[in-house]
A protein has these predicted regions:
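Phosphate/dinucleotide-binding and metal-coordinating scaffold of catalytic cores
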Residues: 1-173
Length: 173
């Protein structure tokens, strides 16, 4: 995808320098456009069917967005996203509040968390979280390389969880 976690991206044409800062730009969505975009996520995961490509791990529907003047926008071309937007998991309407409460609880005990908020586009609720693998400076953004423990330990993603042979806490430290 054009917008993968960290500093990895796949391009059909000439690759861009992923270490450079890029001016944040994108198409700002109206509330109605945002609601439609969110509601289409289960049918078009990871921007399938558009000229955008992104890669976000996990089973939950989500999309990568940029914030422009406190408005949600779809990033232009290969511009790194600033935030991840997640609707509720279908059939589990409280997942948005659950994620919000868990992160705020972590913050209360001194764990640093990214900026988060619960938003609403017409009748559609969403959870918005700022990306930790980005650096923003003077209105420009760049990707920060990161790896999860499976990547760092050369463990296939099929063994993501400890119960399936993935890394345990002892191996992480």
């Amino acid at each position: 995808g054009y917008d993968c976690a960290g500093a990895v991206a796949f391009f059909k044409d000439k690759p861009k320098n992923l270490k450079e800062f890029h001016r944040i730009k994108g198409k700002i969505l109206s509330e109605t456009e945002l609601e439609k975009y969110i509601n289409e996520l289960p049918k078009k995961p990871l921007a399938v069917g558009s000229d955008k490509r992104l890669s976000l791990a996990g089973a939950q529907d989500k999309t990568a967005v940029v914030m422009i003047k406190n408005k949600i926008a779809i990033p232009d071309d290969t511009i790194p996203s600033t935030n991840i937007l997640k609707p509720a998991i279908q059939g589990f309407d409280e997942t948005i509040e659950n994620e919000y409460i868990c992160l705020k609880s972590a913050e209360k005990i001194g764990i640093s968390i990214p900026k988060i908020e619960i938003g609403k586009a017409n009748n559609t609720k969403y959870f918005l979280i700022e990306r930790y693998d980005r650096e923003i400076k003077d209105g420009k953004i760049r990707r920060i390389h990161q790896e999860d423990f499976c990547q760092a330990s050369n463990i296939p993603s099929a063994y993501k969880y400890q119960s399936e042979g993935g890394v345990d806490f002892k191996r992480c430290i």
